[in-house]
Amino acid sequence: MQSTAPHRPPQPSRLALYLDLIRWSRPAGWLLLLWPTLSALWIAAGGFPGWHLLAVFTLGTILMRSAGCCVNDVADRDFDRHVKRTAQRPVTSGAVSVREALGVGAVLALVSFGLVLTTNAATIAWSLPALAVTIAYPFAKRFVSMPQAVLGVAFSMGIPMAFTAVGGAVPMLAAWLVLGNLCWVLAYDTEYAMVDRDDDLKIGMKTSAITLGRHDVPAVMAFYLAFVALWAWALAPFGLGWPLHAVLAAMLLQVAWHWRLIRHRTREGCFRAFTGNHWLGFTLFAGIVAGFALR
């Protein structure tokens, strides 16, 4: 006699849940953080920075972004259950407890700090405010009308750290690169916020998409153009030649493509624009690498 008990799908392992927690299958997030960090590392070193620093900043970027996901999901768990896109995240659904998520985040942050300890005192010092901003960002969405600016600071901390790791100090050049990167984060994370705008309005979440209102698309385009212009201006003295010029042209074409994706403000178009942003960062990084190699 066959059992009539309903079939239950196999439950995911703890490892699978932790990988989902840190968005392991969705690398676009850490790539957005990685490309400007590596670009700054190449600029600071005047070319290839060596395998040690390349490994430290690549692994550190992935680890800290993953730790940030843990903190973010704990902080947003009561909001995420009301948003279609985030309702099934491990912490929100109860598959991973708050204590577990914070534990995973702490381990990842400690491993990342261990990597920083192999650099120098200045870089270690800069890692502390970097950690503080990473923790603060999820809570900024409750109080700041443009929390994407706080994320922009968090996602730009690798730039001064790259300069201190190479030269022990942060030149004025790094400030211009940070400002440009901040504009880029404002552009792509506003696209991201446009995806969830209807849900965020219902639950009282503050985002740049809500703050900008009907000016969101022009503002995103202005942020993109400011990003390209600031990095082009900062890189001009290095004489990177045709690779940089070609890359800047390619970046402007990508910006135009983003306008086509978001101009009607559809969820699908805005999300596609956001997830495709890592190609913009990779394009810039590739131009910088080629420019220094051929200089």
UniProtKB/Swiss-Prot annotation:
The keyword Transferase applies. It comes from the Bacteria. Its EC number is 2.5.1.39. The keyword Amino-acid biosynthesis does not apply. Disulfide bonds: none annotated. It is found in: Cell inner membrane. CDD domains: PT_UbiA_COQ2. One of its GO terms (cellular component) is plasma membrane. GO terms for molecular function: 4-hydroxybenzoate polyprenyltransferase activity. It is an enzyme of class 2 (transferase). It catalyses: all-trans-octaprenyl diphosphate + 4-hydroxybenzoate = 4-hydroxy-3-(all-trans-octaprenyl)benzoate + diphosphate. The chain crosses the membrane at residues 28-48, 51-71, 101-121, 124-144, 159-179, 220-240, 242-262, 274-294. Belongs to the UbiA prenyltransferase family. This is 4-hydroxybenzoate octaprenyltransferase. It comes from Paracidovorax citrulli (strain AAC00-1) (Acidovorax citrulli). The lineage of its organism: Bacteria, Pseudomonadati, Pseudomonadota, Betaproteobacteria, Burkholderiales. The gene is ubiA.
